[in-house]
C-alpha cells in the first residue's frame, strides 16, 4: 500500500527536466473536490448524536478507512484514525499523480505534516502521553511514512527519536532539543518550514510559482496575525513576540510588524484597519477579548476564502490544487472537532465556534 511506503520528492526545481501536468491534476482535483462535504451538512451533524455522526462517517467517503482500521480501533479513536488516514492517502495521491514543478511545490508544502507529526510525538513524550494517544494525532501526509512515524512514537526517549531523524532536514534543528526547550524547538521547526517554502519560490519565474508564492505569503500573514493577537492579548513582551514571527508575509512585512509590536492591544487592533484582512475580522475584533477562538477560526476562513476566489481566476494552475488541500484539511478538522466535542459533551456553542464553514 502506498501509504506504507516512505516516499521522496520525484523532482526539484533544479532538476526540472519533466514538465508539469497541471491540466491533468486540476481535472483530478475537481473530481476529488466534488466529494467534499457540502456546507449544509455541518448544521445537520451538529443536531446528531455521536452514534448518528459515526454512522454518517461510515457511509461517506471515509468508509474504506473506517473498514480497514475497525479491527484495530473502536469508538471515537477509530474515526480519529480513519480521518487521519484518509487525509494522508488523499495528499499522497496528489504527490503521486503530479509531475515536475507541480510535484515539487506540492511536496514542499505538505512537509508541514512531517513537522506536525514530529512535534506531536515529542510533545506527547514530554507530557507522558501513551503511544496510542500520540498515534491518534499522527498524519503521514508529508514525506515521512506512517510505519516510520509509528516507530518514532514507540521509542522510549526523545534522544532516540531525534537520532532516528538524523538523516532528515529536520535534524539540525532537532538536535538542539535538550528535553526542556520544546516550545523553542517547535517554533524553530515552523520557521524552518516557512523559510524553506519561501526559498522554494524565491524570485519565482513561472506564473504558477508566482501564484504559489502569493498563497504561501498570505498563509504567513494569517499565522503572524494569529500570533500577534494571541500574545499581545496575553500581555507578552514585544521581544518575545518578535521571536515567534515568521518572515515573508505578503501584506505584513517584518517592517510592518515591527511597527505593530510596541502598540498596546487596543491601538494594535485599530492599526489593522488598513490591511486587507480587516474586512474579514472587523466584526469579531474588540479592544478587549476574553477568547480568540472565534477570531482564529475567522482567520482560517479568510485564508480558505482567498484561495477559493483565486482558484476561479486561475483554473488550470496550482491554485485550485492548494484550494483543495485547504478545504480537505478543513473538512477533517471540522469532523474531528464535532466528534471530539460531542464525545466530551461540550456545549454546542463551543463546538460551533471552532468550526470553519
Swiss-Prot record:
Locations listed in the record: Cell membrane
Gene this protein is translated from: atpC
Organism, as annotated: Methanococcoides burtonii (strain DSM 6242 / NBRC 107633 / OCM 468 / ACE-M)
Protein family: Belongs to the V-ATPase V0D/AC39 subunit family.
Classification via InterPro entries: ATPase_csu/dsu_sf, ATPase_V0-cplx_csu, ATPase_V0-cplx_csu/dsu, V-ATPase_V0D/AC39_subunit, V-type_ATPase_csu/dsu, V-type_ATPase_csu/dsu_dom_3
One example GO MF annotation: proton-transporting ATPase activity, rotational mechanism
Primary location class: membrane
Keyword Membrane: yes
Record's subunit section: Has multiple subunits with at least A(3), B(3), C, D, E, F, H, I and proteolipid K(x).
HAMAP family: ATP_synth_C_arch
Name under which the protein is recorded: A-type ATP synthase subunit C
Amino acid at each position: 500500500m502506498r501509504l506504507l511506503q516512505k516516499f521522496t520528492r520525484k523532482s526539484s526545481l533544479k532538476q526540472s527536466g519533466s514538465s508539469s501536468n497541471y491540466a491533468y491534476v486540476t481535472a483530478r482535483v475537481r473530481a476529488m473536490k466534488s466529494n467534499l462535504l457540502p456546507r449544509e451538512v455541518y448544521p445537520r451533524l451538529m443536531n446528531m448524536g455521536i452514534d448518528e455522526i459515526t454512522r454518517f462517517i461510515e457511509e461517506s467517503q471515509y468508509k474504506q478507512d473506517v473498514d480497514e482500521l475497525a479491527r484495530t480501533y473502536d469508538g471515537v479513536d477509530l474515526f480519529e484514525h480513519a480521518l487521519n488516514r484518509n487525509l494522508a492517502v488523499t495528499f499522497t495521491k496528489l504527490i503521486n499523480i503530479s509531475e515536475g514543478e507541480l510535484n515539487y511545490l506540492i511536496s514542499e508544502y505538505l512537509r508541514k505534516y512531517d513537522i506536525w507529526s514530529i512535534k506531536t510525538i515529542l510533545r506527547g513524550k514530554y507530557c507522558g502521553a501513551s503511544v496510542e494517544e500520540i498515534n491518534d494525532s499522527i498524519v503521514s501526509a508529508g514525506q515521512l511514512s506512517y510505519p516510520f512515524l509509528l516507530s518514532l512514537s514507540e521509542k522510549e526517549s526523545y534522544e532516540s527519536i531525534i537520532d532516528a531523524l538524523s538523516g532528515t532536514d529536520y535534524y539540525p534543528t532537532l538536535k538542539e532539543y535538550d528535553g526542556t526547550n520544546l516550545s523553542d524547538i517547535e517554533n524553530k521547526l515552523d520557521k524552518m518550514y516557512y523559510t524553506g517554502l519561501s526559498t522554494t519560490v524565491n524570485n519565482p519565474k513561472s506564473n504558477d510559482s508566482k501564484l504559489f508564492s502569493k498563497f504561501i505569503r498570505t498563509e504567513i500573514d494569517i499565522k503572524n496575525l494569529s500570533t500577534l493577537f494571541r500574545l499581545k492579548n496575553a500581555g507578552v513582551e514585544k521581544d518575545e513576540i518578535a521571536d515567534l514571527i515568521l518572515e515573508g508575509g505578503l501584506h505584513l512585512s517584518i517592517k510592518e510588524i515591527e511597527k505593530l509590536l510596541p502598540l498596546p492591544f487596543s491601538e494594535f487592533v485599530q492599526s489593522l484597519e488598513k490591511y486587507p484582512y480587516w474586512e474579514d475580522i472587523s466584526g469579531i475584533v474588540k479592544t478587549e477579548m476574553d477568547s480568540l477562538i472565534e477570531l482564529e477560526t475567522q482567520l482560517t476562513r479568510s485564508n480558505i476564502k482567498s484561495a477559493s476566489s483565486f482558484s476561479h481566476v486561475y483554473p488550470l494552475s496550482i491554485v485550485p490544487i492548494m484550494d483543495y488541500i485547504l478545504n480537505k484539511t478543513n473538512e477533517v478538522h471540522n469532523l474531528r472537532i464535532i466528534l471530539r466535542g460531542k464525545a466530551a459533551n461540550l456545549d454546542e456553542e463551543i463546538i460551533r465556534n471552532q468550526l470553519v464553514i
